[in-house]
Amino acid sequence: MKAETRFIRQIQKMASDVEFQSKHIRDGEKDFKRTRKLTFSDVIMYTIGNTRSPLELEAQRFSKYLTADEISGAALCKARQKIKYTAFEELFEQTAASAPKDKRFHGYHLYAVDGMKGELPKTPELSTKYCETEKCKTPVFHAVSTFDILNEMFIRSKFHFGIADERELAGKMIDAVAQDVYYKDEPQIWIFDRGFPSLSSVSYTHLTLPTILR
């Protein structure tokens, strides 16, 4: 079985699980309770399979996938808002943990860490929540991710809405990996880009794991 097919089946199984749904639905008393065209699992699969085409084209394509009556883009957007972002976070972490990780460097996994910034849609809600100062014109997010270089996949990410300290996010991510049952006993070498070195980060990683700081 191809890896892509296995991941899709794993995601479908998780998204269909009642316990998983109850953790990640915004309003457990009313969301996805009545019989509707779109189920929780449907919305998950739509969101993951979105190719960033115009909304109505994506809706038409997904309607054909469901072999059901045509579903509007507005209906998909409304249904997506009923699911917490934590659902996708857990799906990402679980599928990454189950992926093959056979390629190593002299027995070590090579993990590279880097950060990025991005802009969010300039809506009143996001501007109110994520603009930290009056001078902020556009709501932004900050993310730091860990990439398994030899196995070519992301294994962990940390997001912060607004301006963040990349070193602090990297430390939290390292702690999460170090405590994760899938990774904690694996020999690892972590590689950090030039924006990460500092006295605190060097001291922290030196005590925690083998590290290369650019």
Give residue ranges: language-model regions:
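Short, conserved catalytic/metal-binding motifs centered on acidic residues
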Residues: I44-Y46, I71-L76, L110-G118, S145, ...
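Conserved small/polar residues in nucleotide/adenosyl-binding loops
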Residues: T205-T211
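Dynamic "connector" segments at or just before major functional cores
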Residues: M1-N50
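A short acidic-Thr-Gly-centered motif at the start of a beta-strand
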Residues: A97-F105, K172-D185, S200
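Short, positively charged, Gly/Tyr-enriched micro-motifs
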Residues: K37-I83
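Active-site-proximal, Lys/Arg-enriched surface segment
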Residues: A79-T146, L150
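Electropositive, glycine- and tryptophan-enriched low-complexity nucleic-acid-binding patches
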Residues: E134-V181
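Hydrophobic, well-ordered beta-alpha structural blocks that scaffold small-molecule cofactor pockets
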Residues: G162, S200-S203
